[in-house]
Design a protein with these regions (language model features):
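A broad detector of the eukaryotic-type serine/threonine protein kinase catalytic domain
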Residues: 9, 130-133, 166
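Beta-strand-loop-alpha "switch" segments that mediate conformational coupling across diverse proteins
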Residues: 159-164
Length: 200
């Protein structure tokens, strides 16, 4: 059974990104995947202190919930990640997780001095993001960060769902087609990871 980790990076429990991710999770489970949900706002994860306690081992020296999250990510075949846009970047919750994954970069490039043994093609990620404005470059910064974050996680971007013009909690409910699209994307990821074909 394919294992997927779903990461909720919004500070709101019932926000638009959370609602979309819930649909993606439902779709992945419908496809037969084992999905574990992680709500970053509920965890105690310190920002990176740049003390390079990871320099010799590739393991972060800070003792908090990051270690548990990383362990789950490393065991996953797929990732579902959702974050709102804050100042043309990801939420603070996700940015902290990204920065703490510097220890992975250190492990790969300083300690092992070789790429991870994990096949990058095997771990796939679906990324969902919602922004309030309708600017053409709204997602440029966030996608650049995600590209390099997923590279550190030895993951490839399977699909992105980017939605503009939603700011207040519940706005996504006015767009049922977005929720349907998110569920379909989660289902598709689950099927692909399970080695199955997508239903027509």
């Amino acid at each position: 059974m394919a294992k997927i980790v779903a990461i909720y990076a919004s500070p709101r429990r019932k926000g638009n990104t959370a609602s979309l991710l819930q649909q993606a999770v439902a779709g992945a489970r419908e496809a037969g995947a084992d999905v574990e949900e992680i709500v970053l706002r509920d965890l105690k994860i310190s920002p990176c202190l740049e003390i390079y306690g990871c320099a010799k081992t590739g393991k972060c020296a800070i003792k908090d919930d990051f270690g548990l999250v990383l362990e789950k990510i490393e065991k996953a075949d797929g990732l579902l990640i959702a974050s709102p846009v804050f100042f043309y970047a990801v939420s603070a919750h996700l940015k902290i997780l990204m920065d703490r994954c510097q220890s992975l970069w250190v492990k790969k490039n300083w300690v092992d001095k070789a790429p991870s043994t994990k096949n990058p093609a095997a771990r796939k990620a679906l990324f969902i993001s919602v922004g309030a404005t309708k600017g053409r470059k709204l997602f440029d910064g966030i996608m650049l960060s995600m590209r390099y974050f997923l590279d550190v996680l030895d993951a490839t971007l399977f699909k992105t769902l980017l939605y503009r013009g939603m700011d207040f909690e519940g706005d996504v409910q006015k767009h049922p087609e977005y929720l349907t699209e998110a569920k379909a994307a989660g289902y598709e990821l689950g099927r692909i990871l399970a080695g199955g074909k997508i239903d027509a």
